[in-house]
C-alpha cells in the first residue's frame, strides 16, 4: 500500500510539471504573469523618476523663482514708471526700465555717485610724462656708459648705422663691378688657388671686427678677437672710425666679402661642413665637387664632406680642369661662384649613373 501511494504521488507530480510547462498556460498562470510584469513596470518608473527628479525639479524651481523675481521687479518698475505699463517682461524691456529708473533717480537725487570714470587732471598727466621721460633718459645714460672695457650701444647709436655698415652701403656698386670682372676672367686649373673665391686664415681673422650683420654666425672665426665683440652683436666702431688706415682696410675687406659671398643655400643649414671655423663651401675653390685634392697640393677636405660618400667613377679623373667644365653649358655654374646648379638631365645621368636608372 505504501508503495502504491508513492507511485500515485509521483504521477501527480509529473502531470503538474507537464501542465506547468505546456504551451497553453492555465488562466491562473496568465494572471500571475500579467501582475508581475505590471509590478515590475511600476517599480522601474519610480526609479527613473527618482534618478531624474532632483535635477529636473531643481532646474524647474530655479527657473520659476527667477521669473517670479523678474515679474516682481517689473511690477515695481511699472509702478514707478507709468510709461512702461503693459510692456512684456522680456530682458530688453527690463534693462530699458532699469536704465530709465537709474537716470530718473540720479536726476531726482543729485547726491548719488555718478557712474562716469574720473579723468586724471592735467597736472597729474604732465607728472606721469615727466617720470617716463626721466626713466628713458636714465636707461640711455646707463647704456652709453662703458662696462669693463666693452662699449654698450646706446639708444642713439641703435638708430644710426655704424661707419663700417655705411661703407658697405657706399661700396655696393664697386662690389658689383668686381663681381662682373671675376665672371669675365678666364678660370685656371684646380692646382692654382683662387684668391677671389677662397679665404685664407689671416684674412678671415682680420675680418672679425668688421663683419656685416647679414653674415651667418658660422662664418665668424673663432679667434682671440672674439672677446672684443659686444654680446648683443655690436662691435667697437669708435676706434675703427678714428683710424683712417683701418677704415680703408675695412672698405677693401668689405669689397672682398661682397664679391665672394656664396649663396646662402649652400653655406648655411644642417648639412654644411665647417673647416677651421668657416663653412666648407666657403673655404674651398669650385673644384671641390670634382674629388679629393690631396694629391694636387690643395687643402684636404673634411671627413664628413659629400665627396667621401660619392661613387669612384665620380672622383675618377684627377686631371680634369675647370676650363673643360666652363666650356659646357652655362647652366652648370651659377652666379655664386662655387655652387654647381642642376645641369641637363643627360649630364646628370653621366655623372651619377647609379642614381638615375
UniProtKB/Swiss-Prot annotation:
InterPro entries: bHLH_dom, HLH_DNA-bd_sf, TCFL5/SOLH1/2. Residues 1-40, 145-210 are annotated as: Disordered. In males, it is mainly expressed in testis, while in females it is mainly expressed in ovary. In testis, it is exclusively expressed in spermatogonia, with a preference for prespermatogonia and type A spermatogonia. In ovary, it is detected in germ cell cysts, primordial follicles, and primary follicles but is undetectable by the secondary follicle stage (at protein level). Expressed in the majority of spermatogonia in adult animals, but not in the most undifferentiated spermatogonial population. Its main location: cytoplasm. It is found in: Cytoplasm; Nucleus. GO terms for molecular function: DNA-binding transcription activator activity, RNA polymerase II-specific; DNA-binding transcription factor activity; identical protein binding; protein heterodimerization activity; protein homodimerization activity; RNA polymerase II transcription regulatory region sequence-specific DNA binding. Signal peptide: none annotated. Residues 1-14 have a biased composition (Basic and acidic residues). GO terms for cellular component: cytoplasm; male germ cell nucleus; nucleus. GO terms for biological process: cell differentiation; oocyte differentiation; oogenesis; ovarian follicle development; positive regulation of DNA-templated transcription; positive regulation of transcription by RNA polymerase II; regulation of gene expression; spermatogenesis. It holds the Pfam family HLH. Induction: Transcription is activated by DMRT1 in undifferentiated spermatogonia. Residues 19-31 have a biased composition (Polar residues). Keywords: Cytoplasm, Developmental protein, Differentiation, DNA-binding, Nucleus, Spermatogenesis, Transcription, Transcription regulation. Forms both hetero- and homodimers with SOHLH2. Transcription regulator of both male and female germline differentiation. Suppresses genes involved in spermatogonial stem cells maintenance, and induces genes important for spermatogonial differentiation. Coordinates oocyte differentiation without affecting meiosis I. PANTHER family: SPERMATOGENESIS- AND OOGENESIS-SPECIFIC BASIC HELIX-LOOP-HELIX-CONTAINING PROTEIN 1 (PTHR15402:SF4), TRANSCRIPTION FACTOR-LIKE 5 PROTEIN (PTHR15402). This is Spermatogenesis- and oogenesis-specific basic helix-loop-helix-containing protein 1. The gene is Sohlh1.
Amino acid at each position: 500500500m505504501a508503495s502504491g501511494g508513492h507511485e500515485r504521488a509521483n504521477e501527480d507530480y509529473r502531470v503538474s510539471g507537464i501542465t506547468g510547462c505546456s504551451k497553453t498556460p492555465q488562466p491562473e498562470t496568465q494572471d500571475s504573469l500579467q501582475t508581475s510584469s505590471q509590478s515590475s513596470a511600476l517599480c522601474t518608473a519610480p526609479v527613473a523618476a527618482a534618478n531624474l527628479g532632483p535635477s529636473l525639479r531643481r532646474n524647474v524651481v530655479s527657473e520659476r523663482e527667477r521669473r517670479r523675481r523678474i515679474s516682481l521687479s517689473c511690477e515695481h518698475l511699472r509702478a514707478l514708471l507709468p510709461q512702461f505699463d503693459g510692456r512684456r517682461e522680456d530682458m530688453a524691456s527690463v534693462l530699458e526700465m532699469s536704465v530709465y529708473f537709474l537716470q530718473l533717480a540720479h536726476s531726482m537725487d543729485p547726491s548719488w555717485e555718478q557712474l562716469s570714470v574720473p579723468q586724471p587732471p592735467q597736472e597729474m598727466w604732465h607728472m606721469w610724462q615727466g617720470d617716463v621721460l626721466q626713466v628713458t633718459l636714465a636707461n640711455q645714460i646707463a647704456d652709453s656708459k662703458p662696462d669693463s672695457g666693452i662699449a654698450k650701444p646706446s639708444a642713439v647709436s641703435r638708430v644710426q648705422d655704424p661707419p663700417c655698415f655705411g661703407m658697405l652701403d657706399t661700396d655696393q656698386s664697386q662690389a658689383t663691378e668686381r663681381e662682373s670682372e671675376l665672371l669675365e676672367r678666364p678660370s685656371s686649373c684646380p692646382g692654382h688657388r683662387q684668391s677671389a673665391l677662397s679665404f685664407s686664415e689671416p684674412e678671415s681673422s682680420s675680418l672679425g671686427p668688421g663683419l656685416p650683420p647679414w653674415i651667418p654666425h658660422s662664418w665668424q672665426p673663432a679667434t682671440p678677437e672674439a672677446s672684443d665683440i659686444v654680446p648683443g652683436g655690436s662691435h667697437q666702431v669708435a676706434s675703427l672710425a678714428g683710424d683712417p688706415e683701418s677704415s680703408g682696410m675695412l672698405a677693401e675687406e668689405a669689397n672682398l666679402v661682397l664679391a665672394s659671398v656664396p649663396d646662402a643655400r649652400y653655406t648655411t643649414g644642417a648639412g654644411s661642413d665647417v673647416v677651421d671655423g668657416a663653412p666648407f663651401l666657403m673655404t674651398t675653390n669650385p673644384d671641390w665637387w670634382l674629388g679629393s685634392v690631396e694629391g694636387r697640393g690643395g687643402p684636404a677636405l673634411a671627413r664628413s664632406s659629400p665627396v667621401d660618400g660619392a661613387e669612384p667613377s665620380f672622383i675618377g679623373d684627377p686631371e680634369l680642369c675647370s676650363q673643360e667644365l666652363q666650356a659646357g653649358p652655362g647652366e652648370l655654374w651659377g652666379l655664386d661662384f662655387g655652387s654647381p646648379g642642376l645641369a641637363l638631365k643627360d649630364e646628370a645621368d653621366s655623372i651619377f649613373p647609379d642614381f638615375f636608372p
